[in-house]
Swiss-Prot record:
Its main location: virion. Transmembrane segments: none annotated. The gene is NS. A motif (Nuclear export signal) lies at residues 12-21, 85-94. InterPro entries: Flu_NS2. Belongs to the influenza viruses NEP family. This is Nuclear export protein. It is found in: Virion; Host nucleus. Mediates the nuclear export of encapsidated genomic RNAs (ribonucleoproteins, RNPs). Acts as an adapter between viral RNPs complexes and the nuclear export machinery of the cell. Possesses no intrinsic RNA-binding activity, but includes a C-terminal M1-binding domain. This domain is believed to allow recognition of RNPs bound to the protein M1.
Length: 121
């Protein structure tokens, strides 16, 4: 697991949790929850790849891991759209920077998950 990605996740989550977006705070909390879920999934997939012999364990534990992988990519695409939308409507520079960094992080994580999944297939 890339230490920069871990610190980026932690930084983005901390900054998002400090934001007050008025009536959209539920949306922001949902995004934070999705980010946390995505981080956990990415970490577990990365650990599985590092153990390499663990593919059978992954398949036994979750026979539908490819379906789950597809769902995670859908979540990433949803998060990307949500972050882009928030970026368009916010005028606060702190929030704009946070959402731009969140968007970059999502693209990086999507690429990492693709790389991990190709190694497992």
């Amino acid at each position: 697991m890339d230490p920069n990605t871990v610190s980026s996740f932690q930084d983005i989550l901390m900054r998002m949790s400090k934001m007050q977006l008025g009536s959209s705070s539920e949306d922001l909390n949902g995004m934070i929850t999705q980010f946390e879920s995505l981080k956990l999934y990415r970490d577990s997939l990365g650990e599985t790849v590092m153990r390499m012999g663990d593919l059978h364990s992954l398949q036994n534990r979750n026979g539908k891991w490819r379906e789950q992988l597809g769902q995670k990519f859908e979540e990433i695409r949803w998060l990307i759209e949500e972050v882009r939308h928030k970026l368009k409507i916010t005028e606060n520079s702190f929030e704009q920077i946070t959402f731009m960094q969140a968007l970059q992080l999502l693209f990086e994580v999507e690429q990492e998950i693709r790389t991990f999944s190709f190694q497992l297939i």
